[in-house]
From Swiss-Prot:
Start and end residues of each stretch annotated as Disordered: 96-133, 599-645
Residue span, YDG domain: 273-422
Gene3D superfamilies from the UniProt entry: SRA-YDG, Zinc/RING finger domain, C3HC4 (zinc finger)
Class in the EC hierarchy, top level: transferase
Record's subunit section: Interacts with histones CENH3, HTB2, HTR3 and H4.
Biological process (GO), any one: chromatin organization
Protein's UniProt name: E3 ubiquitin-protein ligase ORTHRUS 2
Pfam families (alphabetical): SAD_SRA, zf-C3HC4_3, zf-RING_UBOX
Pathway annotation: Protein modification; protein ubiquitination
A single GO molecular function term of this UniProt record: methyl-CpG binding
Zn finger region (RING-type): 146-185, 518-575
Keyword tags: Chromatin regulator, Coiled coil, DNA-binding, Metal-binding, Nucleus, Repeat, Transferase, Ubl conjugation pathway, Zinc, Zinc-finger
Organism expressing this protein natively: Arabidopsis thaliana (Mouse-ear cress)
Main location: nucleus
Length: 645
């Protein structure tokens, strides 16, 4: 007697028994294996409509008796029934979510047991945290692949079905006249086939991941740190120096305890070595030695200052021909206006106008507020009668009274000019006076007749002469320092670098998640969908945006029914009509898996940090449970900002 064999529908929806393509209302999907079957070809179709909701196909229900086979195949028969029983057990487990059931079914069908999968999960967890930057790239590479070349997409294009492809692969596929997805055979709209749009969110995410990998792959730079206490007494060079002399020298020990942004004279309390402070007339061999005593910290630049804080000191070293030195007052030229690109560090030709910015702005701010500015003169200033014969000399503090701009001696470009007037309690090195300066009238400057952008101080200066005490002093509180005096110890710097490195990896994941942001709710995507115009939205947000809107509009007039008109539903981010896409928006499962993996890595990193903190603090589990835990929590509505503690 001939055996009646029942067969399901194939991948194209064609019944494998009658070779016809049944309509959807004549097809049934198995609740276990999700395989479509032709109802007319079933030997025992469901009796009622309710029974179709949880219908099981003949293969899964075991209604068909197995074909007579040899005894050697009994193992396969028992294995098949065991597989069906295991799938039914998974479906009956109400504690599992739909996603977890799907994963467990996939494990069983792939021949991998639950125990093997658990061991693999343990191995993954054990290896987590070793290289977080590479984990970020693997999260993309494992889940986000081109459906044609199976590589990380280059210029990714997201199709309406939710699958991604390289732009080049997509255009090649479309050029062959194929209008279906290469993975799921879904129809691709004609408009997208002619004008595909690159998914900018995926581009930014892939770029960030590649940058993090390249940064992790490069050899970390070695920092040679020497604390101030361990530095030699004079500037020194090491075997790493490329040039002889002091061209590559490092600074010696700093002897004064002032911050780099200290204004005014250096008193005795800031000189623990000699207990006398910085005296007018002190000389040093070079600028590096001058730096060690705090007179002028930069060993190359002529201006020490900050544009929003003020200038602390200047050096007269003959850098500009415009400078005029008259001892108790001098005209100083600002910095800039020269092309120093490449190896033109000593270029003396003006190329453009100087402006009141950067160091020049710092001098102007000191002029406005009346701050004292320390002045050192170098033997390189050959045009001045007040320059030392050798080395560098400290000449006291000056105050900037005016500043302006004028065309320089080269005759083409403007330079910034400053009038410095001496205001120190100690006599100048070139005088035989026993007392310091007294307030003197501002000298006549002929070049002011041709000056532009002239600025004169209107308010009372912070550093001024007190007639009652007969000395120069701070009439207003000096500005608070913004820089620390003591440099971090090597161990503290090491811990800080570790914290910065850990924060970088956390920030990289946070930045990646920020790229996967819904354009409507501005939160991390949940069930992401990508429109044909390459904009990403949460599926719920997009559906809620167009809730209550129909695809067609019925029209009538005067009792007559007119032809229905299609409603134009524009994308929330651009004028593109996405009404066809909204009929059945497909979730981009690849992007969803990437987001889920990044969130999991974020949570695992937080757990590892908690464990490390517990080990460092030496607390017991009972004590640790009583203490508040520090966690880096990733919400779906915002990304994590890394914090260094």
């Amino acid at each position: 007697m001939a055996r009646d064999i029942q067969l399901p529908c194939d991948g194209d929806g064609v019944c494998m028994r009658c070779k016809s393509n049944p309509p959807p209302e004549e097809s049934l999907t198995c609740g276990t294996c999700v395989t479509p079957w032709h109802v007319s070809c079933l030997s025992s179709p469901p009796k009622t409509l309710a029974s179709t909701l949880q219908w099981h196909c003949p293969d899964c229900s075991g209604e068909i008796d197995p074909l007579p086979v040899s005894g050697g195949a009994t193992g396969f028969e028992s294995a098949g029934s065991d597989l069906v029983a295991a799938i039914r057990a998974i479906e009956a487990d109400e504690s599992l979510s739909t996603e977890e059931k799907a994963k467990m079914r996939q494990r069983l069908l792939s021949g991998k047991g639950v125990e093997e999968d658990d061991e693999e999960e343990k191995r993954k967890k054990k290896g987590k945290g070793k290289n977080p930057n590479l984990d970020v790239l693997s999260a993309l590479g494992d889940n986000l692949m081109c459906s044609f070349c199976m590589q990380l997409p280059e210029r990714p294009v997201t199709k309406p079905c939710g699958h991604n492809a390289c732009l080049k692969c997509f255009e090649k596929w479309m050029g062959q006249g194929k209008r279906t997805c290469g993975k799921c055979r879904s129809i691709i709209p004609e408009k997208m086939a002619k004008n595909p749009r690159i998914n900018s969110s995926l581009v930014a995410a892939i770029r960030l991941a590649k940058v993090s990998k390249s940064a992790a792959a490069t050899t970390s730079k070695v920092f040679h740190f020497i604390s101030n206490q361990d530095r030699p007494d004079k500037a020194f060079t090491t075997e790493r120096a490329k040039k002889t002399g002091k061209a590559n020298a490092a600074s010696g020990k700093i002897y004064v305890t002032i911050p780099p942004d200290h204004f005014g004279p250096i008193p005795a309390e800031n000189d623990p070595v000699r207990n006398q402070g910085l005296l007018v007339g002190e000389s040093w061999e070079d600028r590096l030695e001058c730096r060690q005593w705090g007179a002028h910290f930069p060993h190359v630049a002529g201006i020490a200052g900050q544009s929003t804080y003020g200038a602390q000191s200047v050096a007269l070293s003959g850098g500009y021909k415009d400078d005029e030195d008259h001892g108790e007052w001098f005209l100083y030229t600002g910095s800039g206006g020269r092309d120093l690109s490449g190896n033109k560090r000593t270029n003396k030709e003006q190329s453009f106008d100087q402006k009141f910015e950067k160091s020049n702005a710092a001098l102007k701010l000191s002029c406005k507020l009346g701050y004292p500015v320390r002045v050192v003169r170098s033997h390189k200033e050959k045009r001045s009668a007040y320059a030392p014969e050798e080395g560098v000399r400290y000449d006291g503090v000056y105050r900037i009274e005016k500043c302006w701009r004028k065309v320089g001696v080269q005759g083409s470009f403007k330079v910034c000019r400053y009038l410095f007037v001496r205001c120190d309690n100690e006599p100048a090195p070139w005088t035989s006076d026993e007392n310091g300066d007294r307030p003197r009238p501002i000298p006549n400057i002929p070049e002011l007749n041709m000056a532009t952008d002239l600025f004169e101080r209107k308010e009372t200066p912070s550093w001024d002469f007190d007639e009652g005490e007969g000395c120069w002093k701070w009439m207003k509180p000096p500005p608070a320092s913004k820089k620390s005096v003591n440099v971090l110890a090597p161990e503290e710097r090491k811990n800080l670098r570790k914290a910065i490195k850990a924060a970088h990896s956390n920030t990289m994941r946070a930045r990646l998640l920020k790229e996967f942001k819904c354009q409507i709710c501005q939160q991390v995507l949940t069930l992401p969908v990508t429109t044909p115009c390459a904009h990403n939205f949460c599926k719920a947000c997009l559906e809620a945006k167009f809730a209550g809107k129909t695809l067609v509009r019925e029209r009538s007039t005067g009792g007559r029914t007119l032809r229905s008109r299609k409603n134009v539903l524009n994308c929330p981010c651009c004028p593109t009509d996405i009404s066809d896409f909204l009929q059945n928006p497909q979730v981009n499962r690849e992007v969803a898996e990437v987001i889920e993996k990044l969130k999991t890595q974020e949570e695992d990193t937080a757990e590892l940090e908690d464990e490390d903190e517990g080990e460092c603090s030496g607390t017991t589990p009972e004590e640790d449970s009583e203490q508040p835990k520090k966690r880096i929590k990733l919400d779906t509505d915002a990304t994590v900002s890394a914090t260094i503690r």
